[in-house]
């Protein structure tokens, strides 16, 4: 009977064992062994010595570099708040990877951030910029001295009014409104300006651009700026047109009365744009998902709150014209897109079967004259990457939580987060240059890997499990890291 029973057992049957908890007295194990790649990158960059230049402490028990590195490690392992550094501190194997580093307690990390002033925050920003210069040289070669940068802002909500300089934003959200500048092709952050919530979208944008364009000029002959309608301003356009700057720009246009007259002019010819013949299906899908539909989605969300629904009824059409903005006193090229949509009210019974059709318009102003309308649209449509970068910086990296009560402490935390963000970009650039993934996927593939950490006289050995079949991958990445950094 027993044999017959075993023979007929379901193929889905599992014999889940009984469990017992023990702690090893000799072997160090971590679930974040992939951080040895980050540790090697940090070692080769001489990052520890550079952060000592901050000179925040007079009497040092724990140096500035250790505090900053603790916050970086916390973000790489998935910590959302300073409090989570206690789990980094509890991981002895992880500390061994970073040279028996002494991890400060969470409240000590908080105290460290609160020591930052305007001067030390600027110093931290400059140190991170110097680290980035080496990778700007590499990007210059990779992209043939041409680069596209993307400027945007984002609102961070806080609760209560205990955080210094927090205020009501244009979205009626109480908090902060930082300005972010990305490298469009790679997602690398060039700069962050931390601002009160009440700051206008473009506040500080010209100063940010001036500081960063001067950094890029030695490495890139062509610089293109992409920006949203919040940066449709005379000061920004004039900056781009300055004789000593001369960069190209594509900025989302406002739709005011003079622009409407141009859009509705009888002579205006609207055509369906030609699609690139060399695009793969995946590229088309990715491009279309970020085309001006993200603007259309904003309209859809807004109307849904009023009980309306929007449906697309027509093909995408494009047109262009030259227009002189009165305040700018100069003529520029405007490129616009439109799509026929239908609006229907689902709440009001009297209008349930009534629908109105109209065109939804979205356009840009540019000083680029040597590219076709399709090329301009293709480039600006990909600006949706910036929205995804900001979302991943907030949610993936974990900057959504504002850690301290002090304004410059929070600014410093955002700069340290920028360092974490860029370390990921720099690491991938070396070991998998074609790979662009979000933080959740990055941690899963590269960081969250269990291994024994064994310290010997000459090495710290990363010993993966017997059945772990990705040892060759990690060996390949480590070799690439060593070769690139030694080159």
Regions found by a protein language model. Give the residues of each.
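Short amphipathic alpha-helical "interface-anchor" segments enriched in bulky aromatics
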Residues: 85, 90, 274, 281, ...
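Dynamic "connector" segments at or just before major functional cores
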Residues: 1-174, 180-200, 206-221, 242-243, ...
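Short, solvent-exposed helix-loop connector elements
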Residues: 52-59, 372-380, 396-412, 427-439, ...
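A short acidic (Asp/Glu
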Residues: 160-161, 233-240, 260-264
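Acidic, metal-coordinating catalytic cores used for nucleic-acid/nucleotide bond scission
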Residues: 225-233, 254-258
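Conserved nucleotidyltransferase catalytic core and NTase-mimicking acidic/glycine-rich helix/loop elements
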Residues: 7, 428-451
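An anionic, glycine-rich sequence signature occurring as long contiguous blocks
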Residues: 2-18, 248-389, 393-395, 451, ...
């Amino acid at each position: 009977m027993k044999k017959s029973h075993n023979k007929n057992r379901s193929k889905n049957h599992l014999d889940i064992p009984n469990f017992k908890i023990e702690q090893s007295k000799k072997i160090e194990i971590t679930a974040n062994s992939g951080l040895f790649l980050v540790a090697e990158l940090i070692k080769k960059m001489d990052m520890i010595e550079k952060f000592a230049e901050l000179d925040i402490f007079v009497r040092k028990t724990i140096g500035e570099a250790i505090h900053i590195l603790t916050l970086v490690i916390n973000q790489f392992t998935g910590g959302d708040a300073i409090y989570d550094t206690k789990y980094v501190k509890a991981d002895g194997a992880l500390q061994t990877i970073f040279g028996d580093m002494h991890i400060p307690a969470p409240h000590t990390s908080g105290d460290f951030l609160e020591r930052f002033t305007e001067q030390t925050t600027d110093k931290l920003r400059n140190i991170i910029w110097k680290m980035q210069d080496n990778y700007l040289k590499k990007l210059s070669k990779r992209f043939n001295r041409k680069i596209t940068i993307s400027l945007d802002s984002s609102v961070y909500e806080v609760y209560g009014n205990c955080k210094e300089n927090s205020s009501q934003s244009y979205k009626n959200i109480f908090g902060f409104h930082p300005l972010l500048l990305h490298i469009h092709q790679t997602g690398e952050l060039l700069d962050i300006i931390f601002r009160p919530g009440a700051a206008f979208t473009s506040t500080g944008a010209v100063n940010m651009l001036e500081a960063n364009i001067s950094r890029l000029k030695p490495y890139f002959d062509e610089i293109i700026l992409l920006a949203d309608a919040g940066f449709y301003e005379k000061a920004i356009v004039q900056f781009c047109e300055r004789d000593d700057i001369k960069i190209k720009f594509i900025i989302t246009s406002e739709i005011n009365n003079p622009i409407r007259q141009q859009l509705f002019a009888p002579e205006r010819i609207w055509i369906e744009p030609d699609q690139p013949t060399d695009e793969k299906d995946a590229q088309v899908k990715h491009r279309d998902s970020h085309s001006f539909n993200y603007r259309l989605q904003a309209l859809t969300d807004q109307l849904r709150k009023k009980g309306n629904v929007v449906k697309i009824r027509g093909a995408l059409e494009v047109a262009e014209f030259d227009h002189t903005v009165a305040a700018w006193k100069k003529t520029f090229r405007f490129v616009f897109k439109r799509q026929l949509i239908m609006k229907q009210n689902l709440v009001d019974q009297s209008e349930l079967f009534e629908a109105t059709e109209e065109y939804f318009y979205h356009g840009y102003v540019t000083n680029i004259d040597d590219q076709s309308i399709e090329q301009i649209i293709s480039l600006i449509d990909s600006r949706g990457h910036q929205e995804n970068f900001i979302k991943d910086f907030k949610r993936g990296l974990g900057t959504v939580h504002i850690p301290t009560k002090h304004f410059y402490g929070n600014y410093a935390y955002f700069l340290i987060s920028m360092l974490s963000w860029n370390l990921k970009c720099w690491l991938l650039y070396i070991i998998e240059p074609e790979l662009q993934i979000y933080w959740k996927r990055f941690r899963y593939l590269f960081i969250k890997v269990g291994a024994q950490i064994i310290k010997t006289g000459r090495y710290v050995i990363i010993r993966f499990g017997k059945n772990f079949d990705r040892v060759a991958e990690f060996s390949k990445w480590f070799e690439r890291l060593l070769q690139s950094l030694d080159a």
